[in-house]
């Protein structure tokens, strides 16, 4: 019988590794420590309260991989709602379909994606926020949430007058049968298909990964897969964060040149990828060597 709970993994990891780097944006060099990440999660929980978010409500996320993308995901999971990660390379029709089909209540997007959201697909959406700085891009009723986000630091300091402490990192563990995420695949016919994953599903996968000792404090990982992809979602984000590892996010699937430079700069201990990316990298290296006569 499964006794562990993914949410408690995060609580323990964030407390234990509060001074360690959690996520780095490769292209902007922005770094979230585990303490910073926990702070952002706490601020998002306050925003969710202001939005009236409920347990069964869905929070959709689409955009370039960055530390705030991960913060929204972790905040949604630890709040007890359901996250809907959307692949950033899906076309506009698929993205609008997923927003509507999932009944998303809140949207977090890279700014360029807000321009493609259609009114009909966002009928149930209460508000949308930018993944660059969490400012409010849209709210259905008035400007309450816009004002709330504008003054979020004041609200945060009022909530934690003695400062945000590791002891304040505390998350209620939802039932293992609770739907934690709905991941949409590209499918072979028609629109994207949604796969519901429970807390128990994700806990089992993360627990197994942790048992293999792939991740831990001081372990560097290079995240190149879209976090909206279930493989990247679990192995480039959930499992490393549950173990105290340091994730460097490339933002999108890289070219062979960018990937080679990133590998040389980050020196990752663990890289999770798919055969297509490895093929691109090795093909480029082998072809260059053949053209220069290094390989005969």
Summary of predicted features, one role per range:
Residues 31-35, 172, 180-206:
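Conserved AMP-binding A3 loop
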Residues 1-22, 39:
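A short N-terminal helical cap/helix-turn-helix that marks the beginning
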Residues 22-66, 70-74, 91-96, 199-200:
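Conserved AMP-binding/adenylate-forming core of the ANL superfamily
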Residues 203-220, 227-296:
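Conserved AMP-binding/adenylation subdomain of ANL enzymes
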